[in-house]
Amino acid sequence: MSGTHQQHADQCKSDFLIATLWRNKPLETIKAYIALTKPRVIELLLVATIPAMLQAERGEHNIILILLTVIGGWMGAAAANTFNMVADSDIDQRMGRTRARPLVKHTVSNRDASIFAWVLTVASFLWLWLLCNSLTAAVFVMITIAFYIFVYTKWLKRRTHMNIVWGGAAGCMPVAVGWAVIVDQFPEGQPQQWWQAIVLFLIIFFWTPPHTWALAMKYREDYKAAGVPMLPVVRTPVQVTRQIVWYSVATVLVTFLLIPAAGWIYAAAAVLAGVAFLWMAIRLHLGIKNGAEVKPLKLFILSNNYLAVLFLALSVDAVLGIQTIGEMMGWNTTFF
């Protein structure tokens, strides 16, 4: 049988299997489509978008607009994650952590997953543009999807150990999307405030490597088997944890840049949570260096909690409209 005929036969077999699943187990199929969107990964969307929007308009908040933005952003993130699963379906088969994914188990076909992703992409663009009145945010989401798939998934991920450093920029975009929606509500805009969005972007940018590498240390053999050159695969544990410490330091330092534009609640969280985050990163490095038994997953979990606490504090600060540190110090309040 020729290659073309074999592919056609495989596709027909897959379509028949999925049609049967849908007819006999519709709930399982729905769950499979939800799994394609990587719900846990999308949690970062909520953690980042909402605080950014609240900070962009301190003391005032439009709940409906925030909800609409989160929905539009969710569709964009879900589209990117689904495209990612389609592109990575070959390596997902070789990783124990990902062998239960829908495309590997053939619960959903690659073709149907791609159609699903395209529908979400178009819906996200139209939603943010028309319902959130922000063409800027809609364009940001399209750029993010393209970057995540073509730059990170298809190029960086399989070619360089710096994949998550540069590819992680896609995960920083929710803050830019949320900020753009608020700015676009004002005809004259607030260009002087964009520096805060850039700081929020950089916080997630520097936070992503230690967060991801901690997880990759645990699943090092999985990545190695799949041929993905994550840093823990191509470097020694000591070298990896040293990089984790440096990126953690950069993360905490960048969080301090936002203190003048925030109140004491955020300032306290940035310092206290930052110390805890740094201590855990340093402890992991010292443990590896001294040959002690360590659990990198603890840092992974703490890094999630760290970002959540930091952005929760920023949200509370913004909602309560607490006087900013910059205002307390008598600095230029127009800028801050």
UniProtKB/Swiss-Prot annotation:
It is an enzyme of class 2 (transferase). The keyword Plastid does not apply. Signal peptide: none annotated. It is a multi-pass membrane protein. Its EC number is 2.5.1.141. Belongs to the UbiA prenyltransferase family. Protoheme IX farnesyltransferase subfamily. Converts heme B (protoheme IX) to heme O by substitution of the vinyl group on carbon 2 of heme B porphyrin ring with a hydroxyethyl farnesyl side group. This is Protoheme IX farnesyltransferase. It comes from Corynebacterium efficiens (strain DSM 44549 / YS-314 / AJ 12310 / JCM 11189 / NBRC 100395).
